[in-house]
Amino acid sequence: MAGDGGRSGPSTPSTSVITKTKPRTKRPNLYRVLILNDDYTPMEFVVHVLEKFFQMDVEAATKVMLHVHHHGIGECGVFTYEIAETKVTQVMDFARKHQHPLQCVMEKK
């Protein structure tokens, strides 16, 4: 037969290997939200902030507040970047609205 390269008979099926690769997802970086001590913000206000923005109960909020008072800084929680940034902004705006100099920052864990 012309055009078949001189072969006759059925064509042989080709085989191929298909490999499935699972996409690897990278875990997002985590950030610590920290409250800084100052000499002017009342302890009760700090406890209120911890309850309101970090869903702490009174005991946990008081424990964190006392740690901030004695050590100058305390961790409120660990979050992804967007959540940490939002919480810092909320705390700073709330403190400013109530005329307190409370400072809240975030740092990469």
UniProtKB/Swiss-Prot annotation:
Instruction: Please list where the region (Disordered) is annotated.
Output: 1-24
Which Gene3D superfamilies does this chain map to? 3.30.1390.10
Instruction: Spell out where the chain crosses the membrane.
Output: none
State the disulfide connectivity: none
According to its UniProt entry, one GO biological process term is: proteolysis
Q: Which NCBIfam families match?
A: PRK00033.1-2 (NF000669), PRK00033.1-5 (NF000672)
Job of this protein: Involved in the modulation of the specificity of the ClpAP-mediated ATP-dependent protein degradation.
Q: Which family does it belong to?
A: Belongs to the ClpS family.
Listed under subunit, the entry gives: Binds to the N-terminal domain of the chaperone ClpA.
Protein name listed in UniProt: ATP-dependent Clp protease adapter protein ClpS 2
